[in-house]
Amino acid sequence: MTEVYIVGAGIHPFGRHDSTGLDQGIFAVRQALSDADVDWDDMQFAFGGSNSAGSADAMLPRLGLNGTQFINVANGCATGGSALLSGYWAIKSGEFDMGLVTGFDKHARGAFAAKPKNYGLPEWYAETGLMMTTQFFAMKIKRYMDMFGITDESLVRVAEKAFQNGSLAPHAWRRTPVDLSLIHISEPTRPY
């Protein structure tokens, strides 16, 4: 089997921008191609997805209609990761040598207004707050912590490290380190 490498990366700065989610995705794709010193015409495949900013294959007319197959991936918040895994296996299998993987999204301000029925879930799921990602993931991490003996302190340190890393990244949404004592305020969801 073939070795697989990520040879280029691109990212659009986080934040509120007037451009569409698709525009932001194309920005990141062009940046990744440039970073790898390759052209769109060099790509043998593309996997991409977006939960709410349109179909990733809508990039084709703007990147170039060169016959490259572009496969849409949909897996909610994990769409980008699932696209990456798909691209990995496309190369690892030996079927292709080089491809593009992208994931992008753009959400309106405020809480997500997902409808449980669209996801095959009962109404009580939303009524109890489980359609809100903060509540859902807070409950999920609490269960994971209990099952595997992960301490509260460990979780807080992960958040601290993430903020520190964000302070080093010019494209990050939050670029200010946050002290452990502030992160520790609100168990289990925390303000950060």
Write out the residue ranges for each language-model feature.
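Condensing-enzyme catalytic core mediating Claisen C-C bond formation in acyl metabolism
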Residues: 1-19, 147, 156-157, 190
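Conserved beta-ketoacyl condensing-enzyme motif
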Residues: 17-85, 91-114
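Short acidic alpha-helix initiation/capping motifs at coil-to-helix transition points
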Residues: 23-25, 132-137
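Active-site-proximal alpha-helical scaffold in enzymes
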Residues: 75-105, 134-168
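Short acidic, glycine/proline-enriched helix-loop-strand junctions
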Residues: 109-127
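Molybdopterin (Moco) oxidoreductase catalytic core of the xanthine/aldehyde oxidoreductase family
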Residues: 118, 126-129, 141, 153-154, ...
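Ligand-binding pockets and gating/stacking loops
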Residues: 168, 174-179, 183
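Single conserved hydrophobic/aromatic residue that forms the stacking wall/gate
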Residues: 183-192
